[in-house]
Amino acid sequence: MTSTKVEDRVTAAVLGAIGHALALTASMTWEILWALILGFALSAVVQAVVRRSTIVTLLGDDRPRTLVIATGLGAASSSCSYAAVALARSLFRKGANFTAAMAFEIGSTNLVVELGIILALLMGWQFTAAEFVGGPIMILVLAVLFRLFVGARLIDAAREQAERGLAGSMEGHAAMDMSIKREGSFWRRLLSPPGFTSIAHVFVMEWLAILRDLILGLLIAGAIAAWVPESFWQSFFLANHPAWSAVWGPIIGPIVAIVSFVCSIGNVPLAAVLWNGGISFGGVIAFIFADLLILPILNIYRKYYGARMMLVLLGTFYASMVVAGYLIELLFGTTNLIPSQRSATVMTAEISWNYTTWLNVIFLVIAAALVVRFITSGGLPMLRMMGGSPDAPHDHHDRHDDHLGH
Protein backbone atom coordinates (compact mmCIF):
# COMPACT_ATOMS: atom_id res chain seq x y z
CA MET A 1 0.00 0.00 0.00
CA THR A 2 2.80 2.36 0.93
CA SER A 3 4.64 1.45 -2.26
CA THR A 4 1.52 2.21 -4.28
CA LYS A 5 1.18 5.61 -2.65
CA VAL A 6 4.80 6.42 -3.44
CA GLU A 7 4.31 5.38 -7.05
CA ASP A 8 1.17 7.50 -7.27
CA ARG A 9 3.02 10.51 -5.90
CA VAL A 10 5.89 10.01 -8.32
CA THR A 11 3.45 9.65 -11.21
CA ALA A 12 1.58 12.77 -10.12
CA ALA A 13 4.85 14.69 -9.82
CA VAL A 14 6.00 13.59 -13.28
CA LEU A 15 2.65 14.41 -14.87
CA GLY A 16 2.62 17.75 -13.08
CA ALA A 17 6.09 18.59 -14.37
CA ILE A 18 5.13 17.62 -17.91
CA GLY A 19 1.92 19.62 -17.65
CA HIS A 20 3.82 22.67 -16.41
CA ALA A 21 6.29 22.42 -19.31
CA LEU A 22 3.47 22.06 -21.84
CA ALA A 23 1.63 25.02 -20.28
CA LEU A 24 4.72 27.20 -20.68
CA THR A 25 5.14 25.97 -24.25
CA ALA A 26 1.51 26.79 -25.08
CA SER A 27 1.82 30.22 -23.48
CA MET A 28 4.96 31.05 -25.41
CA THR A 29 3.39 29.82 -28.65
CA TRP A 30 0.34 32.01 -28.08
CA GLU A 31 2.55 35.00 -27.28
CA ILE A 32 4.50 34.84 -30.56
CA LEU A 33 1.81 33.47 -32.91
CA TRP A 34 0.73 36.78 -34.46
CA ALA A 35 4.33 37.85 -34.94
CA LEU A 36 5.18 34.59 -36.67
CA ILE A 37 2.26 35.00 -39.06
CA LEU A 38 3.21 38.63 -39.75
CA GLY A 39 6.86 37.74 -40.29
CA PHE A 40 6.15 34.89 -42.67
CA ALA A 41 3.58 36.96 -44.55
CA LEU A 42 6.13 39.75 -45.10
CA SER A 43 8.74 37.17 -46.07
CA ALA A 44 6.28 35.64 -48.53
CA VAL A 45 5.72 39.03 -50.15
CA VAL A 46 9.47 39.49 -50.63
CA GLN A 47 10.02 35.96 -51.95
CA ALA A 48 7.09 36.33 -54.32
CA VAL A 49 8.75 39.34 -55.92
CA VAL A 50 12.39 38.16 -56.04
CA ARG A 51 12.91 35.74 -58.92
CA ARG A 52 15.18 32.81 -58.12
CA SER A 53 16.61 32.73 -61.66
CA THR A 54 18.26 36.14 -61.23
CA ILE A 55 20.19 35.22 -58.09
CA VAL A 56 22.93 33.02 -59.57
CA THR A 57 24.05 35.68 -62.05
CA LEU A 58 24.72 38.10 -59.19
CA LEU A 59 26.89 35.75 -57.11
CA GLY A 60 29.80 35.01 -59.41
CA ASP A 61 32.67 36.16 -57.16
CA ASP A 62 33.54 37.05 -53.58
CA ARG A 63 34.02 40.81 -53.90
CA PRO A 64 32.56 42.90 -51.04
CA ARG A 65 29.76 44.17 -53.28
CA THR A 66 28.84 40.62 -54.27
CA LEU A 67 28.79 39.48 -50.65
CA VAL A 68 26.49 42.37 -49.76
CA ILE A 69 24.14 41.36 -52.59
CA ALA A 70 24.32 37.71 -51.53
CA THR A 71 23.47 38.63 -47.95
CA GLY A 72 20.53 40.77 -49.06
CA LEU A 73 19.17 38.09 -51.38
CA GLY A 74 19.53 35.56 -48.59
CA ALA A 75 17.51 37.80 -46.29
CA ALA A 76 14.79 37.79 -48.97
CA SER A 77 14.77 33.99 -49.12
CA SER A 78 13.57 31.05 -47.04
CA SER A 79 14.25 31.19 -43.29
CA CYS A 80 14.23 27.39 -43.00
CA SER A 81 17.82 26.40 -42.26
CA TYR A 82 17.57 23.13 -44.18
CA ALA A 83 16.10 24.85 -47.24
CA ALA A 84 18.74 27.61 -47.04
CA VAL A 85 21.54 25.04 -46.96
CA ALA A 86 20.02 23.16 -49.90
CA LEU A 87 19.52 26.34 -51.90
CA ALA A 88 23.12 27.45 -51.26
CA ARG A 89 24.33 24.13 -52.66
CA SER A 90 22.03 24.58 -55.66
CA LEU A 91 23.44 28.06 -56.34
CA PHE A 92 26.99 26.72 -56.00
CA ARG A 93 26.26 23.93 -58.51
CA LYS A 94 24.88 26.48 -60.97
CA GLY A 95 28.08 28.53 -60.87
CA ALA A 96 27.80 30.82 -57.85
CA ASN A 97 30.98 31.57 -55.93
CA PHE A 98 31.30 29.37 -52.82
CA THR A 99 31.87 32.28 -50.42
CA ALA A 100 28.91 34.14 -51.92
CA ALA A 101 26.75 31.03 -51.57
CA MET A 102 27.68 30.76 -47.88
CA ALA A 103 26.92 34.48 -47.38
CA PHE A 104 23.53 33.85 -48.97
CA GLU A 105 22.98 30.93 -46.59
CA ILE A 106 23.82 33.00 -43.51
CA GLY A 107 21.61 35.87 -44.65
CA SER A 108 18.76 33.45 -45.26
CA THR A 109 18.81 32.05 -41.73
CA ASN A 110 20.00 34.98 -39.62
CA LEU A 111 18.83 38.19 -41.31
CA VAL A 112 15.23 37.43 -42.28
CA VAL A 113 12.40 39.69 -41.17
CA GLU A 114 10.49 37.04 -39.21
CA LEU A 115 13.53 36.35 -37.03
CA GLY A 116 13.87 40.05 -36.22
CA ILE A 117 10.21 40.33 -35.26
CA ILE A 118 10.30 37.29 -32.96
CA LEU A 119 13.54 38.45 -31.32
CA ALA A 120 12.05 41.88 -30.64
CA LEU A 121 8.87 40.37 -29.20
CA LEU A 122 10.49 37.71 -27.01
CA MET A 123 13.70 39.42 -25.97
CA GLY A 124 13.74 43.09 -26.95
CA TRP A 125 14.70 45.32 -29.86
CA GLN A 126 18.35 45.28 -28.81
CA PHE A 127 18.58 41.61 -29.78
CA THR A 128 17.06 42.31 -33.18
CA ALA A 129 19.58 45.10 -33.70
CA ALA A 130 22.42 42.84 -32.57
CA GLU A 131 21.31 40.12 -34.97
CA PHE A 132 21.27 42.47 -37.94
CA VAL A 133 24.60 44.04 -36.99
CA GLY A 134 26.25 40.75 -36.07
CA GLY A 135 25.17 38.90 -39.21
CA PRO A 136 27.25 41.05 -41.60
CA ILE A 137 30.16 40.91 -39.13
CA MET A 138 30.00 37.12 -39.18
CA ILE A 139 29.94 37.09 -43.00
CA LEU A 140 32.92 39.47 -43.16
CA VAL A 141 34.96 37.32 -40.76
CA LEU A 142 33.96 34.18 -42.67
CA ALA A 143 35.06 35.71 -45.99
CA VAL A 144 38.47 36.53 -44.50
CA LEU A 145 38.83 33.01 -43.10
CA PHE A 146 37.87 31.51 -46.47
CA ARG A 147 40.53 33.64 -48.17
CA LEU A 148 43.11 32.34 -45.67
CA PHE A 149 42.18 28.68 -45.38
CA VAL A 150 39.96 27.61 -48.30
CA GLY A 151 42.01 27.10 -51.43
CA ALA A 152 41.03 26.41 -55.01
CA ARG A 153 41.74 22.68 -54.66
CA LEU A 154 39.32 22.35 -51.74
CA ILE A 155 36.67 24.34 -53.63
CA ASP A 156 37.09 22.10 -56.68
CA ALA A 157 36.73 18.99 -54.53
CA ALA A 158 33.61 20.45 -52.92
CA ARG A 159 32.13 21.29 -56.33
CA GLU A 160 32.83 17.76 -57.56
CA GLN A 161 31.04 16.36 -54.51
CA ALA A 162 28.17 18.84 -54.94
CA GLU A 163 27.70 17.75 -58.55
CA ARG A 164 26.88 14.25 -57.33
CA GLY A 165 23.54 15.69 -56.20
CA LEU A 166 23.23 13.72 -52.96
CA ALA A 167 19.99 14.54 -51.18
CA GLY A 168 20.00 16.36 -47.87
CA SER A 169 16.77 17.78 -46.47
CA MET A 170 14.05 20.05 -47.90
CA GLU A 171 15.59 19.68 -51.37
CA GLY A 172 12.28 19.98 -53.16
CA HIS A 173 11.31 23.05 -51.18
CA ALA A 174 14.63 24.72 -51.97
CA ALA A 175 14.24 23.95 -55.68
CA MET A 176 10.79 25.55 -55.97
CA ASP A 177 10.70 29.04 -57.45
CA MET A 178 7.31 30.37 -56.35
CA SER A 179 7.92 33.98 -57.41
CA ILE A 180 5.47 35.92 -59.61
CA LYS A 181 6.20 35.21 -63.27
CA ARG A 182 4.15 37.96 -64.92
CA GLU A 183 5.71 41.30 -65.89
CA GLY A 184 4.74 44.75 -64.65
CA SER A 185 5.41 47.12 -61.78
CA PHE A 186 6.02 45.89 -58.25
CA TRP A 187 2.51 46.71 -57.02
CA ARG A 188 0.80 45.48 -60.18
CA ARG A 189 2.53 42.12 -59.90
CA LEU A 190 1.99 41.89 -56.15
CA LEU A 191 -1.72 42.77 -56.21
CA SER A 192 -2.56 40.56 -59.18
CA PRO A 193 -4.27 37.16 -58.74
CA PRO A 194 -0.97 35.35 -59.47
CA GLY A 195 0.65 37.61 -56.87
CA PHE A 196 -1.84 36.54 -54.21
CA THR A 197 -1.28 32.92 -55.22
CA SER A 198 2.51 33.26 -54.98
CA ILE A 199 2.29 34.85 -51.54
CA ALA A 200 -0.08 32.11 -50.35
CA HIS A 201 2.16 29.35 -51.69
CA VAL A 202 5.35 30.77 -50.18
CA PHE A 203 3.58 31.45 -46.87
CA VAL A 204 2.23 27.91 -46.46
CA MET A 205 5.38 26.18 -47.70
CA GLU A 206 7.59 28.25 -45.38
CA TRP A 207 5.41 27.40 -42.40
CA LEU A 208 5.55 23.70 -43.22
CA ALA A 209 9.31 23.86 -43.73
CA ILE A 210 10.04 25.30 -40.28
CA LEU A 211 7.13 23.78 -38.34
CA ARG A 212 9.08 20.78 -37.02
CA ASP A 213 11.94 22.90 -35.70
CA LEU A 214 9.59 25.54 -34.33
CA ILE A 215 7.58 22.97 -32.35
CA LEU A 216 10.77 21.26 -31.16
CA GLY A 217 12.26 24.58 -30.08
CA LEU A 218 9.14 25.59 -28.17
CA LEU A 219 8.93 22.20 -26.44
CA ILE A 220 12.60 22.27 -25.45
CA ALA A 221 12.32 25.86 -24.24
CA GLY A 222 9.22 25.03 -22.21
CA ALA A 223 10.84 21.95 -20.69
CA ILE A 224 14.04 23.78 -19.77
CA ALA A 225 12.12 26.71 -18.30
CA ALA A 226 9.99 24.34 -16.22
CA TRP A 227 12.59 21.80 -15.14
CA VAL A 228 16.04 23.44 -15.08
CA PRO A 229 16.56 25.91 -12.24
CA GLU A 230 18.05 29.28 -13.14
CA SER A 231 20.82 28.64 -10.62
CA PHE A 232 22.18 25.91 -12.92
CA TRP A 233 22.36 28.26 -15.91
CA GLN A 234 23.84 31.04 -13.79
CA SER A 235 26.65 28.72 -12.74
CA PHE A 236 27.09 27.28 -16.23
CA PHE A 237 27.29 30.70 -17.88
CA LEU A 238 29.40 32.25 -15.05
CA ALA A 239 26.69 34.86 -14.55
CA ASN A 240 28.17 36.05 -11.25
CA HIS A 241 31.50 36.85 -12.94
CA PRO A 242 30.62 39.40 -15.68
CA ALA A 243 34.08 39.59 -17.24
CA TRP A 244 34.49 35.82 -17.51
CA SER A 245 30.86 35.48 -18.61
CA ALA A 246 31.51 37.83 -21.54
CA VAL A 247 34.49 35.67 -22.56
CA TRP A 248 32.73 32.33 -22.01
CA GLY A 249 29.35 33.17 -23.59
CA PRO A 250 30.31 33.38 -27.29
CA ILE A 251 32.45 30.25 -26.92
CA ILE A 252 29.80 28.05 -25.30
CA GLY A 253 26.70 29.55 -26.99
CA PRO A 254 27.26 27.89 -30.39
CA ILE A 255 28.12 24.58 -28.70
CA VAL A 256 24.79 24.59 -26.84
CA ALA A 257 23.07 25.29 -30.17
CA ILE A 258 24.93 22.46 -31.93
CA VAL A 259 23.75 19.83 -29.45
CA SER A 260 20.20 21.22 -29.16
CA PHE A 261 19.25 20.06 -32.70
CA VAL A 262 17.00 23.14 -33.03
CA CYS A 263 17.35 25.53 -35.96
CA SER A 264 15.50 28.23 -37.89
CA ILE A 265 13.07 30.32 -35.83
CA GLY A 266 12.84 27.45 -33.34
CA ASN A 267 16.01 28.42 -31.49
CA VAL A 268 14.71 31.86 -30.46
CA PRO A 269 12.49 30.59 -27.59
CA LEU A 270 15.46 28.62 -26.28
CA ALA A 271 17.64 31.72 -26.64
CA ALA A 272 15.15 33.58 -24.43
CA VAL A 273 15.47 30.87 -21.77
CA LEU A 274 19.27 31.01 -21.92
CA TRP A 275 19.24 34.80 -21.66
CA ASN A 276 17.06 34.65 -18.57
CA GLY A 277 19.46 32.01 -17.26
CA GLY A 278 22.49 34.26 -17.46
CA ILE A 279 24.28 33.80 -20.80
CA SER A 280 26.10 36.92 -21.97
CA PHE A 281 24.67 39.21 -24.64
CA GLY A 282 27.32 38.21 -27.18
CA GLY A 283 26.85 34.59 -26.16
CA VAL A 284 23.14 34.52 -26.92
CA ILE A 285 23.73 36.16 -30.32
CA ALA A 286 26.41 33.55 -31.12
CA PHE A 287 23.93 30.87 -30.02
CA ILE A 288 21.30 32.15 -32.47
CA PHE A 289 23.85 32.25 -35.31
CA ALA A 290 24.79 28.61 -34.73
CA ASP A 291 21.63 27.06 -36.18
CA LEU A 292 23.73 26.39 -39.29
CA LEU A 293 25.99 24.06 -37.28
CA ILE A 294 23.52 21.70 -35.62
CA LEU A 295 24.47 18.03 -36.03
CA PRO A 296 21.92 17.14 -38.77
CA ILE A 297 23.11 20.07 -40.89
CA LEU A 298 26.77 19.12 -40.39
CA ASN A 299 25.88 15.71 -41.81
CA ILE A 300 24.24 17.43 -44.79
CA TYR A 301 27.42 19.47 -45.35
CA ARG A 302 29.33 16.18 -45.45
CA LYS A 303 26.96 14.85 -48.13
CA TYR A 304 27.00 18.09 -50.11
CA TYR A 305 30.67 19.05 -50.04
CA GLY A 306 32.65 16.13 -48.56
CA ALA A 307 34.00 15.41 -45.07
CA ARG A 308 36.98 17.76 -45.34
CA MET A 309 34.90 20.76 -46.38
CA MET A 310 32.38 19.92 -43.66
CA LEU A 311 35.14 20.18 -41.06
CA VAL A 312 36.36 23.43 -42.62
CA LEU A 313 32.83 24.85 -42.50
CA LEU A 314 32.48 23.75 -38.88
CA GLY A 315 35.74 25.46 -37.91
CA THR A 316 35.29 28.67 -39.91
CA PHE A 317 31.60 29.12 -39.11
CA TYR A 318 32.25 28.52 -35.41
CA ALA A 319 35.18 30.94 -35.34
CA SER A 320 33.19 33.64 -37.15
CA MET A 321 30.27 33.20 -34.73
CA VAL A 322 32.58 33.55 -31.72
CA VAL A 323 34.27 36.65 -33.16
CA ALA A 324 30.90 38.19 -34.06
CA GLY A 325 29.67 37.47 -30.52
CA TYR A 326 32.70 39.19 -28.99
CA LEU A 327 32.38 42.23 -31.26
CA ILE A 328 28.66 42.53 -30.54
CA GLU A 329 29.36 42.32 -26.80
CA LEU A 330 32.00 45.05 -27.14
CA LEU A 331 29.99 47.30 -29.46
CA PHE A 332 26.70 47.12 -27.60
CA GLY A 333 28.44 47.23 -24.22
CA THR A 334 30.34 50.43 -24.97
CA THR A 335 27.16 52.07 -26.29
CA ASN A 336 25.11 50.92 -23.26
CA LEU A 337 22.67 49.00 -25.45
CA ILE A 338 22.89 45.70 -23.58
CA PRO A 339 19.68 45.30 -21.54
CA SER A 340 20.34 45.62 -17.83
CA GLN A 341 17.39 43.37 -16.95
CA ARG A 342 16.98 39.80 -18.12
CA SER A 343 13.32 40.25 -18.90
CA ALA A 344 12.45 37.74 -21.62
CA THR A 345 9.31 37.10 -19.57
CA VAL A 346 6.94 35.60 -22.13
CA MET A 347 6.72 32.28 -20.33
CA THR A 348 3.81 32.44 -17.95
CA ALA A 349 1.61 29.44 -17.38
CA GLU A 350 -1.63 31.15 -18.35
CA ILE A 351 -3.14 32.89 -21.38
CA SER A 352 -5.20 36.04 -20.87
CA TRP A 353 -7.52 38.08 -23.08
CA ASN A 354 -5.38 41.08 -24.05
CA TYR A 355 -3.91 42.81 -27.09
CA THR A 356 -1.95 39.65 -27.95
CA THR A 357 -5.19 37.69 -28.21
CA TRP A 358 -6.73 40.31 -30.51
CA LEU A 359 -3.62 40.33 -32.72
CA ASN A 360 -3.63 36.53 -32.85
CA VAL A 361 -7.28 36.49 -33.93
CA ILE A 362 -6.64 39.07 -36.68
CA PHE A 363 -3.56 37.33 -38.04
CA LEU A 364 -5.13 33.88 -37.80
CA VAL A 365 -7.87 35.17 -40.13
CA ILE A 366 -5.18 36.40 -42.54
CA ALA A 367 -3.38 33.05 -42.30
CA ALA A 368 -6.65 31.21 -42.95
CA ALA A 369 -7.23 33.27 -46.11
CA LEU A 370 -3.74 32.40 -47.37
CA VAL A 371 -4.22 28.71 -46.59
CA VAL A 372 -7.56 28.67 -48.43
CA ARG A 373 -5.89 30.31 -51.44
CA PHE A 374 -3.08 27.76 -51.27
CA ILE A 375 -5.54 24.85 -51.32
CA THR A 376 -7.89 26.25 -53.97
CA SER A 377 -5.06 27.24 -56.33
CA GLY A 378 -3.54 23.77 -56.61
CA GLY A 379 -1.00 24.01 -53.82
CA LEU A 380 -1.57 20.63 -52.19
CA PRO A 381 0.48 18.63 -54.77
CA MET A 382 3.46 20.84 -53.87
CA LEU A 383 3.55 19.26 -50.42
CA ARG A 384 4.64 15.96 -51.93
CA MET A 385 7.58 17.69 -53.61
CA MET A 386 9.04 19.35 -50.50
CA GLY A 387 11.53 16.59 -49.79
CA GLY A 388 12.12 15.60 -53.40
CA SER A 389 15.31 15.30 -55.40
CA PRO A 390 17.35 18.47 -55.94
CA ASP A 391 17.38 17.72 -59.66
CA ALA A 392 13.67 16.97 -60.03
CA PRO A 393 11.57 19.44 -62.05
CA HIS A 394 9.43 21.80 -59.99
CA ASP A 395 7.16 23.50 -62.49
CA HIS A 396 3.84 23.09 -60.69
CA HIS A 397 3.70 26.72 -59.72
CA ASP A 398 4.40 27.90 -63.23
CA ARG A 399 1.39 25.99 -64.57
CA HIS A 400 -1.17 27.46 -62.27
CA ASP A 401 0.45 30.91 -62.50
CA ASP A 402 -0.53 30.79 -66.15
CA HIS A 403 -4.00 29.61 -65.16
CA LEU A 404 -4.56 32.58 -62.83
CA GLY A 405 -2.79 35.18 -64.89
CA HIS A 406 -5.72 36.06 -67.14
UniProtKB/Swiss-Prot annotation:
<feature type="transmembrane region" description="Helical">
    <location>
        <begin position="208"/>
        <end position="228"/>
    </location>
</feature>
<feature type="transmembrane region" description="Helical">
    <location>
        <begin position="361"/>
        <end position="381"/>
    </location>
</feature>
<feature type="transmembrane region" description="Helical">
    <location>
        <begin position="111"/>
        <end position="131"/>
    </location>
</feature>
<keyword id="KW-0472">Membrane</keyword>
<feature type="transmembrane region" description="Helical">
    <location>
        <begin position="246"/>
        <end position="266"/>
    </location>
</feature>
<dbReference type="Pfam" id="PF03773">
    <property type="entry name" value="ArsP_1"/>
</dbReference>
<dbReference type="InterPro" id="IPR053166">
    <property type="entry name" value="UPF0718_permease"/>
</dbReference>
<keyword id="KW-1003">Cell membrane</keyword>
<keyword id="KW-0812">Transmembrane</keyword>
<feature type="transmembrane region" description="Helical">
    <location>
        <begin position="67"/>
        <end position="87"/>
    </location>
</feature>
<feature type="transmembrane region" description="Helical">
    <location>
        <begin position="30"/>
        <end position="50"/>
    </location>
</feature>
<feature type="transmembrane region" description="Helical">
    <location>
        <begin position="132"/>
        <end position="152"/>
    </location>
</feature>
<comment type="similarity">
    <text>Belongs to the UPF0718 family.</text>
</comment>
<feature type="transmembrane region" description="Helical">
    <location>
        <begin position="278"/>
        <end position="298"/>
    </location>
</feature>
<dbReference type="InterPro" id="IPR005524">
    <property type="entry name" value="DUF318"/>
</dbReference>
<keyword id="KW-1133">Transmembrane helix</keyword>
<dbReference type="GO" id="GO:0005886">
    <property type="term" value="C:plasma membrane"/>
</dbReference>
<feature type="transmembrane region" description="Helical">
    <location>
        <begin position="312"/>
        <end position="332"/>
    </location>
</feature>
<protein>
    <recommendedName>
        <fullName>Putative permease Rv2963</fullName>
    </recommendedName>
</protein>
